[in-house]
Structure formats: structure tokens, C-alpha cells
């Protein structure tokens, strides 16, 4: 067994990332979890958050929307609706989107489908800003 895992991040449009990493931290729906080589196989739902590849100053951060993760001992596959590298985030544009979503959300009934759509937009905007700063949300 090696000391690395193959990581793939896939959206409906394209393969965003295919890398070999030593450690990946993933935003599971029940909280963040780390994956090293030899991890027990599992499937998890994902929430919007930040995928961190590596550790310390060399870490790469990727904002992802909700989706699913398949973990195997030597491979992690993330299927998400959207993904953006932290270094490519336009902070001003994302902040504007976040603020608009928050304003709309404040007047929307929590049981509505519109509320869920706005909540997803807000969560992904927050994930993008966190990825830009190299933080987990």
C-alpha cells in the first residue's frame, strides 16, 4: 500500500482535478473528514465547503458545492455541482453574490424550494471566500 491517494473532483460539466495527494480533507455533511492512503471504503454526502489537499503553506484549497464522495483505500472521487480553486476566486464578485443571497434569504419562508436554492448559493459563496483565504468553513 502506498502513502498517496488519487483524488478526482468532477462536476457535471468536466473533470476539475485529478491529482495524487498524501492527504485530502473533505467537507462531509456531518463535518470535515481527512483521507489518507488505506482509508476504509465509504460513501458520504458532501456539503458546500473547502477541500484541502496537503497541509501547511503548501496546501491547495478548492471550494465545492454539495455532492457526494466515494472513498477507497487508494482513491477519492468527489462528485459536486460546482468547484472553484481558491486562488481563482473573485472576492468582490462572490461577496456581492453572498450579500444578495443573504438579503433574499432573510425574507424567504424556510419551507420553500426557493429558500433551499438561496441557502445553497450562500453556502457556496462562503466556501469560495474561505478557499480564497485558505480556511475551512
From Swiss-Prot:
It is found in: Cell inner membrane. InterPro entries: ATP_synth_F1_dsu/esu, ATP_synth_F1_dsu/esu_N, ATPsynth_dsu/esu_N. Keywords: ATP synthesis, Cell inner membrane, Cell membrane, CF(1), Hydrogen ion transport, Ion transport, Membrane, Transport. Pfam families: ATP-synt_DE_N. One of its GO terms (cellular component) is plasma membrane. It is a peripheral membrane protein. F-type ATPases have 2 components, CF(1) - the catalytic core - and CF(0) - the membrane proton channel. CF(1) has five subunits: alpha(3), beta(3), gamma(1), delta(1), epsilon(1). CF(0) has three main subunits: a, b and c. PANTHER family: ATP SYNTHASE DELTA/EPSILON CHAIN, ATP SYNTHASE EPSILON CHAIN, CHLOROPLASTIC. Produces ATP from ADP in the presence of a proton gradient across the membrane. Belongs to the ATPase epsilon chain family. This is ATP synthase epsilon chain. It comes from Magnetococcus marinus (strain ATCC BAA-1437 / JCM 17883 / MC-1).
Amino acid at each position: 500500500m502506498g502513502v498517496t491517494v488519487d483524488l478526482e473532483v468532477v462536476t457535471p460539466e468536466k473533470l476539475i482535478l485529478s491529482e495524487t495527494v498524501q492527504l485530502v480533507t473533505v467537507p462531509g455533511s456531518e463535518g470535515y473528514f481527512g483521507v489518507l492512503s488505506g482509508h476504509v471504503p465509504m460513501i458520504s454526502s458532501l456539503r458546500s465547503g473547502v477541500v484541502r489537499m496537503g497541509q501547511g503553506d503548501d496546501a491547495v484549497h478548492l471550494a465545492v458545492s454539495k455532492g457526494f464522495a466515494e472513498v477507497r483505500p487508494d482513491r477519492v472521487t468527489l462528485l459536486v455541482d460546482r468547484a472553484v480553486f481558491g486562488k481563482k476566486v473573485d472576492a468582490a464578485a462572490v461577496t456581492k453574490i453572498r450579500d444578495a443571497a443573504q438579503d433574499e434569504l432573510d425574507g424567504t419562508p424556510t419551507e420553500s424550494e426557493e429558500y433551499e436554492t438561496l441557502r445553497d448559493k450562500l453556502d457556496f459563496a462562503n466556501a469560495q471566500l474561505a478557499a480564497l483565504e485558505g480556511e475551512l468553513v
